[in-house]
Regions:
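Short aromatic/hydrophobic "clamp" motif used to bind/position activated sugar donors
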Residues: 84
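Short beta-strand-to-loop element that shapes/binds the nucleotide-sugar donor at the catalytic cleft/hinge
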Residues: 112-126
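C-terminal catalytic/acceptor-binding lobe
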Residues: 153-155, 159-255
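A conserved acidic beta->alpha catalytic loop
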Residues: 40-50, 88, 92
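Cell-envelope/extracellular polymer assembly enzymes that use nucleotide-activated donors
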Residues: 5-8, 37, 160
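Glycine-rich, basic loop-to-helix element that forms the pyrophosphate-binding segment
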Residues: 62-79
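Short, acidic, metal-binding catalytic loop of nucleotide-sugar glycosyltransferases
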Residues: 22-35
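Acidic donor-binding/catalytic loop of UDP-sugar-dependent glycosyltransferases
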Residues: 91-104
Length: 255
């Protein structure tokens, strides 16, 4: 009997299959022995994403969700399991993420997130650095339901979610003091050719910051022929050996 919990990974995407393919590959490389699934929720109507794999469900919506917070809630509702991992479509997760997180996850607490991550900017690795890094977290459906999910917001939806957790379940959202050699999350900034919702402004209650700007960014690139349209068979792969990149950086820091 498998004693390891089944996990669902939530991956939202909008108009950037080239980075999504790397995120899916990150999932496929996971060394976790328990059952797992990746839910890819796409609401860019110009693309129908196609990928056939028993552990990956790609869901294409013909209409865009009003906010990314509501999109997250829908993805969680579609998840088969009750331990949920946020899986950003433009970042990298090393193969030990699921295993390491489950090993350090306390079901009574219901939340796990490391305090630090690597930063990859224009191909150069930096860090470790601390930030919110909600997309490196996992949590139980019990906690999610306890705060009624994510707020109907754009930029800042993740911050508000964790603030609600901290208020409703004191101590739950405290991050884990991870060692450099244990870090599994690589936050990518410049160099992907894509957008960051956070670059369009800070959280303002009720303003859905970043929503329209992301849509405009994608529309403009599509008009220039820089974003593929129609049916897109996904071909997951990494553009760089990120395991080796981190290993080399750690060796340099140790010296």
């Amino acid at each position: 009997m498998d004693s390891q919990p089944a996990v669902s990974c939530i991956c939202l995407t909008y108009g950037r299959p080239q980075v999504l393919e790397e995120a899916i590959h990150s999932f496929l490389l996971q060394d976790y022995a328990g059952r797992k699934e990746l839910i890819v929720l796409n609401d860019y109507a110009g693309q129908t994403l196609i990928f056939d794999h028993p552990e990956v469900r790609v869901i294409n919506c013909p209409q865009r969700f009003r906010t990314v917070g509501e999109k997250m809630n829908v993805a969680v509702a579609l998840a088969a399991h009750d331990l949920l991992f946020v899986w950003d479509d433009d970042d990298i997760y090393l193969p030990h993420r699921l295993r390491f997180s489950v090993e350090h996850y306390d079901p009574q607490k219901g939340f796990f997130k490391p305090a630090q991550a690597w930063l990859l900017n224009q191909g150069a690795l930096q860090g470790p650095l601390g930030n919110l890094f909600h997309v490196g977290s996992c949590w139980s459906r019990r906690l999610f339901d306890g705060v009624r999910g994510y707020p109907a917001e754009g930029t800042g939806y993740d911050l508000i979610f964790e603030e609600r957790l901290a208020k409703q379940f004191p101590g739950s959202a405290k991050p884990y003091a991870i060692r450099p050699e244990e870090i599994y999350y690589i936050y990518r900034w410049g160099g992907t050719g894509s957008y960051h919702m956070s670059q369009f402004g800070h959280y303002k209650p009720g303003q859905n910051v970043g929503h329209n700007q992301v849509e405009t960014f994608v529309q403009q690139r599509a008009k220039r022929g820089e974003i593929r349209q129609g049916a897109i068979p996904l071909q997951p792969c990494w553009q760089t050996d990120y395991r080796q990149l981190v290993a080399s950086y750690l060796a340099t820091v140790a010296d």
